[in-house]
């Protein structure tokens, strides 16, 4: 199949006009055959995207809003993995139904597109791919209506068809928030444990629980400064229910700062069958790429207009994809592959606690919270391994290997994930030894980056963080990596080798020896998130063992040696890190969540010597501005040659360097 078909450019124009007419007349509600997993696909809106803006050869885009109803047979082995599916209410055919919100962004004329379907797994209902790949600011990245919402136009300029499918059944469906309406097990109750770090001093502190409280009298709360401390119930600590979901925690007057860890336990009621979210993504993507009926809004000239599918997700959504693969959902109910490629972004070695009763899909255990949370358990990596800690043999690709439905995988992480999300477990075995990734897997660490930064951010402060926050946006390398993923799938062109710290290379080390220098203004204490194995069958989980966790080796500027090193690290004007300690008064023995730090270099040798800074000053590094700009251009050319930067991004970054804005310090 050609990468970008250019023939039959108007073959589907009549069909597109007919679809618009149907929508304008009211609602397009079409029913698929009964044996299909998607039994109803209801288009509620089909309008021009980006205010009719056109994108070169691809032309204009349509924004389609729909609702997809899936119908699952609990007896099908491919569905049997879904927790509580057998307990859910059934329809007349004995199947269990759920309905997902769907948004599709497709070329006006599908034949002008690239043939690639990019499924951006919603993050708490939101669209994040446009923000990362297109530098599109929120809320425009979530709306896709105004001309500027397309940002740089990278994705649409390539002719990509983008899809979002609501999968999260514990959030409401709302404008700008895609969700799944799943069955609820009325009257079922169970114990739930949640953790809160408030990072403010208001007292009492409000909090929202994941599930409805069955018995407000059973609500209890404990406090400790960090997770490894003993739980305490000091004088003045209490919790009360304001309604079924909202509570208020009264905090002790002394003994704990604003970053203390509060653990709330209660009996919850009426769980939803959350695991159906995995099936919703599986079945809708399989339907869109393979169904040839008029029901499918991606059909062109009687056949689907997409030829390959890539699953992409940021943070929570990246963890979703790792679980999706591990649970076997990359095989549809006809035994076919769903995604040809997967790109989990900033997931680290984590998964998620979704496919269980009273799961918490939105929970992200952050330092100093529970390192043994049910989402963060073995297996951590793609290869199948024996785990001496849990006694299990497993791997994220175990099930897809058995069914021959494994995708090509490109996991990308910020540097923050190697400090906060145990990313070293991707490339070590449970004993801490070097581990090679499978040949169909690549891993890339975007060195010097926080978990996620908005495009256009500059140096700033957060009250609860000790250091200025790192503003580095990962868009440029991520655009290059998406292009290489498409080439890998469409043309068989191997992507660059993995670029991550590794034990065998000496770039993945114990935290105590990672920093070779003492840098004023960049205090290093080796803080990172541990990995524990715990018994969750008891109300207060009991730790049974730990896995070795390593961190990136740093250079004398305090920056990671390995990984995909952005131009800001190769030709630096400051130190950029993936970690940022909490400030005094906010739990300083822990990391501030999701952030890195940036500490500018001194202007001259005299200034740095006076402050005791061992890092060469700007004047010592670059003879003048012209030398700095030339160094940036040279580094950009090298990154393009390695396929880690696109030519147009190389030019844009060089222009920013010339304007004094590449470092994002102002």
Which residues are covered by each model-predicted region?
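C-terminal His-loop and adjacent cap/lid subdomain of alpha/beta-hydrolase
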Residues: 14, 37-666
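Short, Lys/Arg-enriched N-terminal segments with co-localized hydrophobic residues
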Residues: 1-17
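Generic alpha-helical structural signal
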Residues: 5-10, 25, 548-550
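Sec-dependent signal peptide recognition
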Residues: 19-25
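Bacterial N-terminal signal peptides
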Residues: 25-31
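Sec/Tat signal peptide C-region and signal peptidase I cleavage site
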Residues: 32-36
């Amino acid at each position: 199949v050609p990468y970008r078909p250019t023939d039959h450019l108007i073959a589907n124009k009549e069909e597109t006009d007919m679809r618009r007419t149907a929508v304008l007349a009211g609602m397009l509600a079409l029913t698929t055959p009964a044996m299909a997993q998607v039994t109803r696909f209801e288009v509620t809106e089909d309008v021009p995207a980006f205010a009719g803006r056109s994108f070169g050869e691809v032309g204009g885009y349509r924004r389609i809003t729909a609702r997809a109803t899936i119908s699952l047979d609990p007896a099908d082995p491919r569905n049997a993995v879904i927790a509580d599916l057998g307990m859910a209410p059934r329809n007349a055919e004995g199947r269990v139904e759920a309905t997902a919100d769907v948004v599709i962004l497709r070329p006006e004329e599908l034949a002008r597109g690239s043939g690639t379907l990019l499924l951006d797994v919603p993050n708490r209902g939101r669209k994040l791919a446009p923000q990362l790949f297109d530098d599109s600011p929120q809320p425009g990245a979530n709306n896709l209506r105004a001309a500027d919402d397309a940002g740089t136009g990278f994705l649409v300029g390539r002719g990509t068809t983008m899809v979002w499918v609501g999968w999260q059944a514990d959030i409401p469906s709302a404008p700008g928030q895609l969700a799944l309406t799943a069955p609820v097990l009325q009257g079922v109750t169970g114990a739930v444990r949640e953790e809160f770090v408030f990072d403010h001093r208001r007292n009492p502190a409000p909090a929202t629980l994941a599930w409805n409280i069955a018995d407000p009298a059973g609500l209890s709360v404990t406090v400790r400064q960090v997770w490894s401390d003993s739980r305490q119930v000091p004088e003045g600590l209490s919790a009360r229910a304001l309604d079924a979901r909202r509570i208020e925690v009264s905090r002790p007057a002394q003994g704990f700062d604003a970053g203390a860890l509060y653990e709330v336990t209660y009996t919850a009621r009426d769980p939803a069958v959350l695991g159906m979210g995995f099936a919703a993504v599986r079945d809708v993507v399989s339907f869109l790429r393979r169904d040839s009926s008029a029901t499918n809004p991606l059909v062109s000239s009687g056949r689907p207009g997409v030829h390959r599918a890539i699953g992409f997700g940021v943070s929570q959504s990246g963890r979703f994809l790792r679980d999706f693969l591990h649970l076997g959902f990359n095989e549809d109910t006809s035994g076919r592959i769903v995604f040809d490629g997967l790109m989990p972004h900033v997931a680290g070695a984590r998964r998620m606690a979704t496919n269980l009763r009273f799961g918490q899909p939105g929970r992200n255990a952050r330092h100093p919270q529970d390192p043994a949370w049910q989402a963060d358990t073995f297996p951590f990596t793609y290869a199948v391994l024996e785990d001496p800690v849990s006694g299990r043999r497993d791997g994220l690709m175990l099930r897809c290997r058995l069914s021959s439905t494994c995708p090509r995988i490109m996991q990308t992480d910020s540097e923050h994930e190697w400090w906060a999300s145990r990313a070293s477990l991707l490339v070590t075995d449970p004993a801490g030894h070097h581990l090679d990734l499978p040949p169909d897997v690549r891993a890339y660490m975007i060195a010097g980056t926080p978990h996620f930064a908005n495009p256009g951010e500059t140096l700033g402060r957060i009250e609860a963080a000790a250091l200025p926050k790192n503003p580095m946006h990962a868009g440029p390398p991520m655009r290059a990596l998406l292009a290489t993923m498409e080439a890998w799938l469409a043309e068989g062109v191997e992507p660059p080798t993995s670029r991550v710290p590794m034990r065998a290379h000496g770039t993945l080390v114990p935290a105590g020896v990672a920093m070779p220098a003492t840098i004023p203004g960049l205090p290093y204490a080796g803080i990172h998130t541990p990995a524990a194995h715990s018994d969750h069958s008891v109300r207060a989980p009991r730790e049974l063992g730990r896995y070795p966790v390593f961190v990136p080796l740093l250079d004398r500027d305090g920056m990671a040696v390995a990984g995909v090193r952005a131009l800001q690290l190769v030709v630096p004007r400051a130190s950029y890190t993936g970690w940022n300690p909490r400030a005094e008064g906010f739990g300083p023995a822990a990391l501030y969540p999701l952030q890195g730090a940036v500490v500018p270099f001194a202007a001259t040798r005299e200034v740095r010597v006076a402050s005791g800074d061992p890092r060469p000053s700007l004047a010592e590094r670059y003879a003048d501005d012209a030398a700095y700009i030339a160094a940036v251009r040279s580094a950009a050319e090298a990154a393009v040659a390695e396929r880690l930067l696109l030519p147009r991004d190389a030019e844009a970054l060089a222009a920013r360097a010339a304007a004094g804005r590449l470092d994002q310090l102002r």
